Curated annotation (Swiss-Prot):
GO terms for cellular component: cytosol; nucleus; proteasome complex; proteasome core complex, alpha-subunit complex; proteasome storage granule. The gene is PRE9. SUPFAM superfamilies: N-terminal nucleophile aminohydrolases (Ntn hydrolases). The lineage of its organism: Eukaryota, Fungi, Dikarya, Ascomycota, Saccharomycotina. It comes from Saccharomyces cerevisiae (strain ATCC 204508 / S288c). It is found in: Cytoplasm; Nucleus. The keyword Cytoplasm applies. The keyword Ubl conjugation applies. Keywords: Cytoplasm, Isopeptide bond, Nucleus, Proteasome, Ubl conjugation. This is Proteasome subunit alpha type-3.
Amino acid sequence: MGSRRYDSRTTIFSPEGRLYQVEYALESISHAGTAIGIMASDGIVLAAERKVTSTLLEQDTSTEKLYKLNDKIAVAVAGLTADAEILINTARIHAQNYLKTYNEDIPVEILVRRLSDIKQGYTQHGGLRPFGVSFIYAGYDDRYGYQLYTSNPSGNYTGWKAISVGANTSAAQTLLQMDYKDDMKVDDAIELALKTLSKTTDSSALTYDRLEFATIRKGANDGEVYQKIFKPQEIKDILVKTGITKKDEDEEADEDMK
């Protein structure tokens, strides 16, 4: 009961030095759909489990977990979608202002730091609450190449080779740590992401309508960085190719959605 004296405002520390509102925000993320980021030698893979599925959703246009910030940076989100939308729009504005001012794309870490500063500010001002969302940032710039970061509601951000946020993150992180290799390619990273999600997802079967996938990699011919968000049919084909979902199971899932 004593803790309730310290959790009504974000600016009040408990006797143990804890900010309960930040901890509550972190707890809300642990119930969100799992999101995974894996950095390969030739690109980055983002994968996420959707929590909202419905036969009424337009599968080709609706996104819940993956968003494009600019041509070279994308994010996967875990937590409150409304909070994520505010930060995503802010990130896009920062990226465009940087491009307008310097005539080049914003470096990945600079954008991550700016968004993390905003998150941190919401933990120390009265009348505000922390953003209830964690991000996995995937991007590329000429100075550091491919980069993968996470940030949480406290405003802390860290760089990773492979990371999971959301539900069952401890189990997912253990699997990633066991199977990740520094020299793996994007195709291998896609298989690892699917394997991890298939073993940690709360649903009984991993189906294409519950997944979102994106990659960031250089084009084979021109060397330009391209960002791709996979369509449902492409995700279905990958599931069949990797053997995680059999073809007849996908056909049954399609029948259920009709």
